[in-house]
Amino acid sequence: MQYSEIMIRYGELSTKGKNRMRFINKLRNNISDVLSIYPQVKVTADRDRAHAYLNGADYTAVAESLKQVFGIQNFSPVYKVEKSVEVLKSAVQEIMQDIYKEGMTFKISSKRSDHTFELDSRELNQTLGGAVFEAIPNVQAQMKSPDINLQVEIREEAAYLSYETVRGAGGLPVGTSGKGMLMLSGGIDSPVAGYLALKRGVDIEAVHFASPPYTSPGALKKAQDLTRKLTKFGGNIQFIEVPFTEIQEEIKAKAPEAYLMTLTRRFMMRITDRIREVRNGLVIINGESLGQVASQTLESMKAINAVTNTPIIRPVVTMDKLEIIDIAQEIDTFDISIQPFEDCCTIFAPDRPKTNPKIKNAEQYEARMDVEGLVERAVAGIMITEITPQAEKDEVDDLIDNLL
């Protein structure tokens, strides 16, 4: 027998009251985006659960994708059979013979949403349990905590059987907590910060600063590949490439070396905030971890934050590097993050950066530059690409855009 569908149960949605259907619809769309790499799979959702109809797709591959989607508590692969007692008996026997191992206990759990069916739930449990004893004479029934709990559901259109429950990712459906702009450098920390924001339902857009010719096409692709890894948790993500060469050259020419990193980060924060405003974001998210590098001391954070009133979320701020690496390996971003491409935060990094920069000093050095003009030109030059779980589709779309 082949699985016909996957029954998906929701996570924290039960607490959302009147907004429940908005959350469910968002989760359905996220599941559809993530499973778009399996064209034959169709997804539906109602108030109680969602269903992914396999239509011949490989269950194992689809299940691996579903495990990553935030907002799912658990799911079960399901067999669909004709709504007939004899067909059900045969199906139950086949399933049990396939999964039973010596010494296992079992239980039949039946329920009917179609109350016109010829047997009620108790009678169905007895009838199907008897069929199991016929097929496996030595099997033992056990009502509490059996090894196999074979669930049977009678609906109007058919009967459905399942015995396995797979744990989901939990969290909230991506997009139900508003939008945030993720400052994505290409290192280890920022993708992990993005992942943790996604888990709490934040719809992220990835803002990446590129400084060609100092940064290479490889560095840009690395950031896009990291973004693609994050799409498996909630669907498509907008990738925003910001031209940053002019600003970095201006900072290098007009500011002392000790303040290069502080001023660079202040410009990045201004630009990200401007993009956030245009694209209706609510917060800025970054991968800063307290004390990890010179720009991540409390004094540096204060000096950099001074250019915006927008809330800055730092999901990894209290984590040790090894804790961050553990998550990066778990979500499969680590190997990409350590690829040897320099990003714009490292190309002009000073040997001895200021660890306790003063806001008044930063403002004094910025007064030598046309700050507003530099920011406006950078924002005007952004390029936006929608990153999907399907790399080939993105590449074809980019090719078409280039031709046009």
Curated annotation (Swiss-Prot):
Tell me yes or no: is Transferase among this UniProt entry's keywords: yes
**Keyword annotations for this protein?**
ATP-binding, Cytoplasm, Nucleotide-binding, RNA-binding, Thiamine biosynthesis, Transferase, tRNA-binding
**Transferase listed as a keyword:** yes
Which subcellular locations apply to this protein? Cytoplasm
What superkingdom heads the lineage? Bacteria
State which Enzyme Commission number(s) the record gives.
2.8.1.4
The record's catalysed reaction(s) read: [ThiI sulfur-carrier protein]-S-sulfanyl-L-cysteine + a uridine in tRNA + 2 reduced [2Fe-2S]-[ferredoxin] + ATP + H(+) = [ThiI sulfur-carrier protein]-L-cysteine + a 4-thiouridine in tRNA + 2 oxidized [2Fe-2S]-[ferredoxin] + AMP + diphosphate; [ThiS sulfur-carrier protein]-C-terminal Gly-Gly-AMP + S-sulfanyl-L-cysteinyl-[cysteine desulfurase] + AH2 = [ThiS sulfur-carrier protein]-C-terminal-Gly-aminoethanethioate + L-cysteinyl-[cysteine desulfurase] + A + AMP + 2 H(+)
Q: Record's Pfam families? A: ThiI (PF02568), ThiI_fer (PF22025), THUMP (PF02926)
Give, as one word, the top-level EC class: transferase
Molecular function terms from GO = ATP binding; CCA tRNA nucleotidyltransferase activity; tRNA binding; tRNA-uracil-4 sulfurtransferase activity
Biochemical pathway: Cofactor biosynthesis; thiamine diphosphate biosynthesis
Q: Which InterPro entries match?
A: Rossmann-like_a/b/a_fold (IPR014729), ThiI_AANH (IPR020536), ThiI_fer (IPR054173), ThiI_N (IPR049961), THUMP_dom (IPR004114), THUMP_ThiI (IPR049962), tRNA_STrfase (IPR003720), tRNA_sulfurtransferase_ThiI (IPR050102)
Q: Which GO terms describe its cellular component?
A: cytosol
A biological process (GO) of this protein is: thiazole biosynthetic process
The text of the family note is:
Belongs to the ThiI family.
HAMAP family assigned to the protein according to its UniProt record, in alphabetical order: ThiI (MF_00021)
Classification via PANTHER family: TRNA SULFURTRANSFERASE (PTHR43209:SF1)
Q: What does this protein do?
A: Catalyzes the ATP-dependent transfer of a sulfur to tRNA to produce 4-thiouridine in position 8 of tRNAs, which functions as a near-UV photosensor. Also catalyzes the transfer of sulfur to the sulfur carrier protein ThiS, forming ThiS-thiocarboxylate. This is a step in the synthesis of thiazole, in the thiamine biosynthesis pathway. The sulfur is donated as persulfide by IscS.
Q: What is this protein called?
A: Probable tRNA sulfurtransferase
Say which species the protein is native to. Answer: Streptococcus pneumoniae (strain ATCC 700669 / Spain 23F-1)
